[in-house]
Amino acid sequence: MSNQGAFDGAANVESGSRVFVYEVVGMRQNEETDQTNYPIRKSGSVFIRVPYNRMNQEMQRITRLGGKIVTIQTVSALQQLNGRTTIATVTDASSEIAKSEGNGKATPVKTDSGAKAFAKPPAEEQLKKKDNKGNTMTQAKAKHADVPVNLYRPNAPFIGKVISNEPLVKEGGIGIVQHIKFDLTGGNLKYIEGQSIGIIPPGVDKNGKPEKLRLYSIASTRHGDDVDDKTISLCVRQLEYKHPESGETVYGVCSTYLTHIEPGSEVKITGPVGKEMLLPDDPEANVIMLATGTGIAPMRTYLWRMFKDAERAANPEYQFKGFSWLVFGVPTTPNILYKEELEEIQQKYPDNFRLTYAISREQKNPQGGRMYIQDRVAEHADELWQLIKNQKTHTYICGLRGMEEGIDAALSAAAAKEGVTWSDYQKDLKKAGRWHVETY
């Protein structure tokens, strides 16, 4: 069977059905591709034709095969001739790998003149056509001139005192994660939701120099957990990994210091820093939050500011009336950090807050594998896309960097159903200050 035949079989749809072409790079050799009879590409892009009703399934399959969707374009009825597109080189998703080599960039497959029909229109043109109100996204980034930054520097840190250090992982969970609250009285360490602070651990490094600071996302609102403007809190996981050569277990210096610190201990604090993850001032904004593990820290600050009674009383100028949606990825149920808080908010504000878990070691994705956050995003991609199109919507991503590719693939598929190229649309979201990412 030829590659072209495999391609046609994958796109066997009725005349007039909507069809899309995925440009894919980076699919790798694995058990599934080992079972095929087709050659594996070593470089360049693979073009895969997908019917509308299989877009999400194909996107998930491509992600499972290690591929990354670069573009998704529509195929009009005029571009389909006897069920064939005019793209010269195409293949079935499970039969080829397009892994970029050398400079790490994709090398496009040569196409004939018909491929010009798939050229991406300017981003602003797409937004004009596809914005839900028919307007371009002209919202400017929020002015951050009044945001406090670097009030305390490494050479003159603030000395805070530990008030409490409480475990967040329940029995049967994986790893150590602590909620640590510090006393800020006697200083001028002001901060707002979405910022980070630096912690300088005691001691010296292997070169005999003082330990360098580590940054941690703040887990409390500007008013602190007690809503008295006197504290700041962190959500810290003890870093633990195997040394690649010796195989010994290695623990992070600063994370171990913090997760085991005793109340009453003094800690060197710097900052605050960061303007990327700030919550919009508009109380009618919509907020999408995608988090894994301790990436919940800034999301907790947003949710407290939006929904906690004491916070709402302390912020009469900000009474949240929008819609927020948290998709939270964790390995097990005992690893759902702040579970009681989250579910209390969901129960109290069902019309304004939606909570979705992705529990990788307990739940299965549609392919039978582990349910990661990107799988949940794919499951709800159409709903999320409709929300993202609203000019009042801000999206926040915090946690493991590995989730970004799957999230982009899911939203690419959803956007393509309306003829929008996600990568271009995302760039405009960033320019408008509506796409916020803090991953590691």
Curated annotation (Swiss-Prot):
FAD binds at residues 214-217, 235-237, 241, 253-255, 294. It comes from the Bacteria. Residues 99-142 are annotated as: Disordered. One of its GO terms (molecular function) is flavin adenine dinucleotide binding. Pfam families: CpcD, NAD_binding_1. InterPro entries: CpcD-like_dom (IPR008213), FAD-bd_FR_type (IPR017927), Flavoprot_Pyr_Nucl_cyt_Rdtase (IPR001709), FNR (IPR015701), FNR_nucleotide-bd (IPR039261), FNR_plant_Cyanobacteria (IPR035442), OxRdtase_FAD/NAD-bd (IPR001433), Riboflavin_synthase-like_b-brl (IPR017938). SMART domains: CpcD. One of its GO terms (cellular component) is plasma membrane-derived thylakoid membrane. This is Ferredoxin--NADP reductase. It comes from Nostoc sp. (strain ATCC 29151 / PCC 7119) (Anabaena sp.). The gene is petH.
